[in-house]
A protein has these predicted regions:
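Short, surface-exposed, polar/charged, turn-prone segments marking secondary-structure boundaries
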Residues: 68, 81, 134-138, 145-148, ...
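A short, charged
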Residues: 143-178
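Segments surrounding the PLD/"HKD" phosphodiesterase catalytic module and close analogs
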Residues: 117-151
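A surface-exposed partner-binding patch
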Residues: 1-115, 170-171, 180-189
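A ubiquitous, low-specificity "background" feature that marks scattered single residues
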Residues: 126, 138, 164, 171-175, ...
Length: 189
């Protein structure tokens, strides 16, 4: 069994036994046609591991805190689906250039208080970013949550994430590529 297969098996086991807030049951996985429609709407492919989570485990409803968002349809908790949220964030960034949303950065899980876990679909390792806009400063709103989606999932499985009570004071590393990826310039003072 490969490392990814072992990880997917562990995630599937926990997904069957732990419900995030707002989810009463684990949804069925998406089919290949749904994944293709999502990728067409986004304009880029999902990283293979993220695609496998949706294709093999469930259409959201598992993972830390509120769990993964569904790919195309709204979940029972009322959060928008991943594709819907990404497209809305990109549009909002065009309307408000002080808050640009990076291309290819897909929100996959809502933390509450407008915070999201996002996968950088352009990075080879599928870096997971934390979007935390409550500082009211775009340069202080993006952090590296985990260097890869694999690591982010392992941290959830191990119960060692920053969002756990025992780790809530953990420092986050700012995402250095934010300005490069948004091609935004600092507002004039």
């Amino acid at each position: 069994m490969t490392e990814n297969e072992q990880l997917l098996t562990s995630v599937a086991d926990k997904a069957r036994n732990v419900r995030p807030w707002g989810w009463t049951s684990l949804p069925e996985p998406v089919d290949a046609a749904t994944l293709a429609r999502a990728e067409a709407a986004l304009g880029f492919p999902l990283p293979p591991l993220l695609a496998d989570l949706y294709l093999r485990i469930a259409d959201g409803g598992f993972g830390p805190e509120y769990g993964l968002l569904p790919l195309l349809d709204s979940p029972p908790a009322g959060e928008p689906a991943t594709v819907t949220q990404y497209l809305a964030n990109r549009e909002s960034g065009r309307e408000d250039p002080d808050w640009p949303w990076p291309e290819g950065v897909l929100p996959i899980s809502h933390w509450g208080c407008a915070m999201y876990a996002c996968v950088d679909c352009r990075s080879p390792q599928a870096t997971v970013l934390l979007f935390e806009p409550n500082a009211d400063d775009t340069d202080q709103a993006w952090y590296v949550d985990a260097p890869s989606l694999k690591e982010w999932l392992r941290v959830w499985l191990d119960g060692t994430g920053w969002y756990e009570e025992t780790n809530e004071d953990a420092e986050q590393t700012p995402w250095a590529d934010f300005r490069i990826r948004t091609a935004a310039t600092a507002p004039a003072s």
